[in-house]
Amino acid sequence: MKKIIIVSGYFNPLHVGHIEYFRKAKAYGDKLCVIVNSDFQRALKGSKPFMNEEERLCIINNLRLVDYAILSVDTDGTVCETIREINSLYVLMEDEGVRLFFANGGDQTNDIIPEREICEKLGIKLIDGLGEKIQSSSWLLDNEK
């Protein structure tokens, strides 16, 4: 059975901690799908703009570790609807040889993420604690010179 690991984030900017997150997530499965949070979501979060969503998506799409990268369609701070759409693609293809997983970095646990409910409803397994928090995009932006 093919395992597809889904991860998400703002990646604004992308840093070494994100690469480690991708590396550890990819080790759990056969393919890595990265959901890039949109500019709308970044504004909701209140973080500084550094790169727009298209630039972030392009960079993530061109990383060797990443098999698929997509822009979040959600209109809140979650990626619940995007996860639902990814799941629907595999249901429509009737690909029963695929198992989906949603993975979180070391600073997140499955007990606190808003995506937990949709993942459980759709039968998507949860993985958490993928490494320690190595860097912070917010810290990098706040300390840029």
Predicted regions and their residues:
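Nucleotidyltransferase catalytic core that binds NTPs
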Residues: M1-K145
